[in-house]
Amino acid sequence: MLYGAIEAGGTKFVCAIGDEEMTIKERVSFPTTTPEETMPLVIDFFKQYQADLAGIGIGSFGPIDIHRDSATYGYITSTPKLAWQNFDFISTMKKEFPIPISWTTDVNAAAYGEYVFGSGKGLSSVVYYTIGTGVGGGALQEGRFIEGFSHPEMGHMLVVPHPKDDFAGSCPFHGNCLEGMAAGPAIENRLGKKGQEVAEDDPYWEIEASYIAQCAYNTTLMFSPDVIIFGGGVMKQRHMLQNVHDAFAKLVNGYVETPELSKYIVTPALEDNAGTLGCLALAREAVLHS
């Protein structure tokens, strides 16, 4: 028995096959161009394994419709990627693969991967953020995603501008939300160079850490999770995690007694495999509950 994973990202689709032990057997990627160009490549990849394919887990860029009783369940909805607006992802896959399919956001899939296999393994409540080209967040409680009328958009929480930061924010909707102030494009728009080109001792990192710490602070007060995981390219800066710990401690100011910060605010144990493994695990769950 095999399981399929689709990480549908804004720049590329990552497709993988895993076995019953959740070992990745093959993984490929395709550019995210248009449904007409990208989806045939995705379908052809899984066709090779169709005889043994039991279920597929999809984690997609969004916004997406997650309500099973909705007429547009399984759609990518109001995405800024015009070619993908109102694309019926689930039906497109179901036509070729009439098997159980799990459907969630790309960041939820990564959160689930960390919950099952990574930094959240064995814990009851996990919140995961990715800080890269954009900022997204997903939360789990006892293995269930925390969501209501839609999936959370945690990356767009408002943050208080740092006193040394006069940048107005790059989010076209909210300006100084977390994504607008801390995502990769915000760094580049502010400094004129990409985050990986900024020196480790540049004073800017104090500003960046303050926004990520505000995110952790807000998350702590709202959910008090067992762990907060920060992934994405920005968090690959070697010094960033300690900077966030320091800024977070100042914000909390002793008001909440959190777990030890080295175990409470962490980076992904699965690194770049979180999304793929999360999709595989969600595919397995879809089969078990079908």
Can you annotate each of these PLM segments?
Residues 1-56, 64-72, 91-101, 116-125, ...:
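ATP-binding/phosphotransfer module of carbohydrate and carboxylate kinases, centering on a glycine-rich
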Residues 29-30, 82, 150-151:
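Residue-level structural signal for beta-strand termini and adjacent loop
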Residues 121-177:
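Glycine-rich phosphate-binding loop of actin/hexokinase-like ATP-binding domains
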Residues 92, 110-111:
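Short alpha-helix plus adjacent loop in nuclease-associated cores
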Residues 12, 109, 133-136:
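Conserved A3 ("GATE") glycine/threonine-rich loop of ANL adenylate-forming enzymes
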Residues 103-107:
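Short loop/edge segments at beta-strand edges and connector loops
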Residues 70-85:
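A charged helix-plus-loop insertion that forms the helical arch/lid used to bind
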Residues 61:
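Conserved NAD(P)H cofactor-binding loop of Rossmann-fold oxidoreductase domains
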